[in-house]
């Protein structure tokens, strides 16, 4: 009984056009990257990132590269990749 309702939502994700999906994925990806960069930058001063991330030095350079990287994200990220991310997000939200 519980498996039936869970199987219904997943199939509803692929129907949307790939263009729309890819755009949404790119936007979400960019936002996630920005948040991650900000979190890492804020965590740097705390001193916790040392054990958390093996590269405590690159936080600053990464921030600068983040801007150009965001522009290339759409080219590097393919519709399939975005679709996978969407499916993962739906599964996580349901769980």
UniProtKB/Swiss-Prot annotation:
It comes from Homo sapiens. GO terms for biological process: signal transduction. It comes from the Eukaryota. Residues 7-19 have a biased composition (Pro residues). The lineage of its organism: Eukaryota, Metazoa, Chordata, Craniata, Vertebrata. This protein is coded from a SMAD5 gene antisense transcript. Residues 1-24, 43-70 are annotated as: Disordered. Expressed in fetal tissues. This is SMAD5 antisense gene protein 1.
């Amino acid at each position: 009984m519980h498996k039936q309702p869970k199987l219904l939502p997943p199939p509803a994700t692929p129907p949307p056009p790939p263009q729309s999906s890819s755009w949404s994925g790119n936007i979400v990806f960019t936002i996630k990257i920005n948040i991650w960069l900000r979190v890492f930058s804020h965590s740097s001063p705390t001193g916790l990132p040392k054990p958390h991330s093996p590269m405590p030095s690159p936080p600053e350079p990464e921030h600068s590269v983040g801007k150009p990287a965001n522009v290339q994200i759409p080219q590097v990220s393919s519709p399939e990749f975005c679709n996978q991310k969407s499916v993962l997000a739906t599964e996580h939200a349901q769980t």
